């Protein structure tokens, strides 16, 4: 078979296929959409498959590496048109010019020097133009983005860069770091910049050299706004499966570089994995948390303690088990409803609540408590108890709290050498991208199943700080198990086990503990 690019470089046309090759490509490039099984239960005739190859044998150019891998796997012959390589890669890119530039940029910086993996990662980006990087949280992704921007701005015609982030904190934090790096490097910030998010000052025109914006705010901009950008950089590109980010990428029609970076890329072969590649490009560089800690020694080792709590009596466990027994029989929504009931039981348990608060109050170092439920006030309840019953400095943060207050909370913890600060925050505000080096403990008090979120939570602890040799993540699980059949394991317990396997697969030291609050007189 032969691969040729369309005139606009958006698609690969695959020709000269045998019937066997065509059928296999159709199978390999067809993925089930998220939650397909729920849709199928609701409507057995629903189409839950999405094909990334059309009837004309065309695939998005970003999936070129998947095409190569499929052909290798099934021993298919594959040739490319003569111009293919230099249209997906930057064949004119000069390696020496890049490495000399980076060396010169940081020559007077006595505090920060790029690691080899950071320089290599950006070298690969400049070589491939449309691609993704998977670099562990705390791996210095913002510094890598800075290196990319500075090189393009000073050495190419790319003068307008769009920097897309998932929340307002990251927009402001990223800009502040860019300016800080300039100051450390003793170079002028000779470029214009702006922020676009819910708390940023509005401007009549945005024609800056670099714009830091949240995808929630950027998606409201008109098509013409995006035509100015030569490069678009998606921070935490695991979110790129969201329609808002896909629309942003579609509108950046003149972007010569489309780059995505994340700490946890979706699993190989999944719909989420393919959709990100189709809009941005393949993962061309990886650097794991294990490598970050054990090879480059740029991150703090994290010890994970999984604490499974038993606090529900037999009668309530039987009621929960009966609910689980009916899942799949009545309505497809029942599984979600049972999970909601389990979460409500966990939130309403006074034994569980006291255990968590006592655990937090006894910590001797700065601690972040992460919760998921805002509507029912679980995090606020923990905050109020700690505020009233401890002598620690306690802060509360959720999506409704102002940026100024959040920054004050972060700075208070960063400056606290006594280790006497606790921040109680929602997972979606402080679970991702927040940079606090002087953080020693994280307590996860509400369940999450997301692989990428687990990676982000661990990353909060991996920042290096002179006061810590290691950090601790305490993961709270809930045991409502009863019986010996396949319905014995409750949903929150399953999530707890999934997270445990996730920690282990990432190479973190994991220890599990079982605490029976019905028998233990803790208070």
Report each predicted region and the residues it spans.
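Conserved SF2 helicase motif VI
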Residues: 265-266, 449-473
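Conserved helicase ATPase core of P-loop NTP-dependent helicases/translocases
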Residues: 198-204, 381, 393-430
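Walker A/P-loop
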Residues: 128-150
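A short beta-strand element within the Helicase C-terminal
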Residues: 229-230, 424-425, 432-447, 456, ...
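Post-DEXD/H (motif II) to motif III coupling segment of the RecA-like Helicase ATP-binding lobe
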Residues: 238-303
């Amino acid at each position: 078979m032969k691969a040729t690019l369309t005139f606009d470089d958006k698609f690969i046309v695959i020709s000269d296929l045998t019937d066997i090759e065509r059928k296999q490509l159709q199978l390999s490039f067809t993925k089930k959409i998220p939650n397909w099984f729920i849709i199928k239960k609701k409507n057995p005739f629903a189409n839950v498959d999405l094909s990334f190859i059309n009837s004309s044998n065309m695939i998005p150019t970003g999936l070129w590496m998947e095409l190569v891998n499929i052909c290798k796997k099934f021993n298919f012959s594959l040739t490319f048109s003569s111009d293919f390589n230099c249209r997906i890669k930057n064949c004119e890119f000069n390696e020496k010019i890049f490495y000399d530039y980076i060396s010169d940029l940081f020559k007077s910086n006595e505090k920060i020097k790029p690691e080899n993996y950071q320089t290599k990662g950006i070298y690969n980006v400049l070589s491939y133009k449309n691609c993704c990087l998977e670099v562990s949280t705390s791996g210095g992704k913002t510094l890598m983005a800075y290196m990319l921007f500075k090189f393009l701005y000073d050495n190419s015609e790319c003068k307008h860069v769009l920097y897309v982030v998932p929340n307002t904190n990251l927009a402001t934090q990223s800009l502040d770091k860019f300016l800080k790096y300039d100051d450390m490097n003793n170079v002028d910030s000779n470029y214009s910049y702006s922020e676009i998010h819910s708390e940023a000052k509005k401007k009549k025109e945005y024609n800056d050299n670099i714009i830091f914006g949240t995808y929630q705010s950027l998606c409201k901009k008109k098509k013409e706004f995006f035509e100015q950008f030569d490069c678009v950089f998606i921070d935490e590109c695991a979110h790129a499966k969201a329609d808002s980010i896909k629309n942003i990428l579609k509108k950046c029609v003149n972007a010569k570089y489309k780059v995505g970076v994340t700490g946890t890329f979706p699993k190989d072969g999944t719909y989420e994995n393919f959709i990100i590649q189709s809009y941005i490009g393949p993962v061309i560089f990886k650097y794991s948390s294990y490598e970050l800690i054990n090879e480059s020694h740029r991150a703090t080792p994290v010890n994970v303690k999984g604490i499974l709590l038993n606090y529900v009596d037999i009668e309530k466990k039987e009621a929960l088990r009966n609910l689980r027994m009916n899942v799949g029989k009545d309505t497809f929504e029942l599984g979600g409803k049972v999970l909601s009931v389990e979460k409500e039981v966990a939130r309403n348990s006074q034994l569980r609540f006291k255990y968590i608060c006592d655990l937090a109050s006894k910590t001797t170092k700065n601690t972040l408590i992460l919760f998921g439920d805002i509507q029912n006030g679980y995090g606020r309840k923990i905050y109020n108890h700690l505020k009233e019953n401890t002598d620690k400095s306690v802060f509360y943060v959720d999506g409704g709290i102002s940026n100024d207050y959040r920054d004050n909370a972060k700075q208070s913890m960063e400056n606290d050498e006594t280790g006497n600060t606790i921040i109680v925050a929602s997972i979606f505000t402080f679970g991702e991208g927040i940079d606090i080096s002087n953080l020693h403990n994280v307590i996860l008090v509400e369940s999450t199943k997301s692989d990428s979120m687990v990676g982000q939570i661990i990353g909060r602890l991996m920042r290096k700080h002179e006061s810590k040799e290691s950090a601790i993540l305490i993961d709270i699980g809930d045991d409502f198990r009863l019986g010996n059949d396949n319905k014995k394991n409750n949903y929150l317990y399953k999530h707890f086990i999934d997270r445990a396997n996730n920690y282990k697969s990432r190479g973190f030291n994991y220890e599990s503990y079982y605490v029976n609050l019905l028998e233990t007189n803790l208070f």
